[in-house]
Curated annotation (Swiss-Prot):
NCBIfam families: rsmG_gidB. It holds the Pfam family GidB. The gene is rsmG. This is Ribosomal RNA small subunit methyltransferase G. Keywords: Cytoplasm, Methyltransferase, rRNA processing, S-adenosyl-L-methionine, Transferase. The keyword Ligase does not apply.
């Protein structure tokens, strides 16, 4: 997917990319490739791959969830900024908080935000389980996002404690979602979430299945969750 195909594909979904936004994506790509030589940010470094499998793929969440109606977003395990920073570029009003367990990536994200002129972004080093217990972050965000971080049964315990009641958890997943949703049903219920809907589609020009899962936060998460760091992955709820 080249730049023009990227713009056209988003326009087909009702999303217009301005010249300024296109420049931001271009700079994002250049910095990602440059810094990837210093640290492991992504296995995908060719321009068409980055535009399709990182930028476009991140923004697909906005095809099924209306980011114009929310203000605060927390992205768990964003790595090199996906999905939240491409979403932030497209929806500049958003206040984005990223939590990532690797401090080197936080350094990259701080530099990236400065270079792209992104305002209303904050980057925090640590584990989602720790932030889910922190009163400053717990049940604070309109939307919590995550892309390819863990299976739903684990991901729910990372993300739902951070979403406010009335907010949403939006997960960007790859193939074979049905089994994950079955496994994760108990976790969603225990943690105060209700599955609203899931959407399956393919990336343009590829037979790569993708899924967007939207979970409504209906009830407060019980105080004992999230459990201590590492426990959700070792012993998923359900």
């Amino acid at each position: 997917m080249n730049q023009q195909q990227f713009v056209t594909a988003l326009a087909e979904q009702g999303l217009e990319v301005s010249d300024h936004q296109l420049q931001q994506f271009r700079k994002y790509y250049e910095l990602l490739v440059e810094w990837n030589e210093k640290m492991n940010l992504t296995a995908i470094t060719d321009e068409e791959g980055v535009y399709l499998k990182h930028f476009y793929d991140s923004i697909t969440a906005a095809f099924y969830f209306d980011f114009t109606k929310v203000e605060t977003v927390c992205d768990v395990g964003a790595g090199a900024g996906f999905p939240s920073l491409p979403i932030k570029i497209m929806f500049p009003h958003l206040k984005v908080t990223i939590i990532d367990s690797l401090n080197k990536r936080i350094g990259f994200l701080n530099m990236l935000a400065t270079e792209l002129g992104l305002e209303g972004v904050a980057f925090h080093h640590g584990r989602a389980e720790e932030f889910g217990k922190n009163k400053q972050f717990r049940e604070h965000f309109d939307v919590v996002t995550a892309r390819a971080v863990a299976r739903m049964s684990v991901l729910a315990e990372y993300c739902l404690p951070l979403a406010r009641v009335g907010g949403q958890f939006v997960a960007l997943k790859a193939a074979k979602l049905g089994e994950e949703l079955e496994e994760g049903a108990t976790a969603l219920k225990v943690l105060g979430g209700n599955l609203r809907e899931s959407f399956q589609f393919q990336l343009p020009g590829e037979e790569s299945e993708r899924n967007i899962v939207i979970v409504d936060k209906k009830r407060l998460t019980p105080g004992k969750y999230p459990r201590k760091a590492g426990t959700p992955a070792k012993d998923p709820l359900g």
